[in-house]
């Protein structure tokens, strides 16, 4: 079992491993850990047969208007409970956390699910 603190550290580690060319583009975004997705998060899930591992809440970079000055930060939530349920050991959990962080950042950059390998 991975504690919440260790899980948060693994999310931070995944962010720290981003190539600088992508990390430098992250602006006005918060990456947080939540235990479970909310009902409204689940409503956004197209395939109810799978666990929701993370979600991007915001406006993708490709759809932003550049004249907006004061925007609330976008948010990526990584869901601890679902990730721990779909993985069998610590190594799998670490890989899934990394893959989920990368996937949700893909949405931030404007990619849809079909356009991502993760």
Question: What are these model-derived regions, one by one?
Answer:
Residues 1-96, 108-118:
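Active-site rim/adjacent substrate-binding subdomains
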Residues 100, 104-108:
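Catalytic glutamate of the conserved HExxH
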């Amino acid at each position: 079992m991975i504690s919440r603190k260790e899980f948060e550290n693994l999310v931070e580690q995944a962010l720290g491993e981003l190539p600088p060319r992508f990390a430098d583009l992250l602006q006005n975004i918060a990456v947080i850990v939540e235990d479970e997705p909310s009902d409204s998060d689940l409503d956004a899930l197209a395939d109810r047969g799978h666990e929701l591992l993370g979600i991007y809440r915001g406006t993708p970079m490709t759809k932003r208007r550049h004249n907006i000055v004061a925007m609330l930060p976008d948010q990526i939530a990584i869901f601890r409970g679902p990730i721990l349920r779909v993985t069998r050991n610590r190594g799998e959990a670490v890989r899934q956390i990394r893959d989920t962080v990368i996937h949700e950042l893909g949405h931030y950059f404007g990619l849809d699910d079909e356009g991502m390998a993760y």
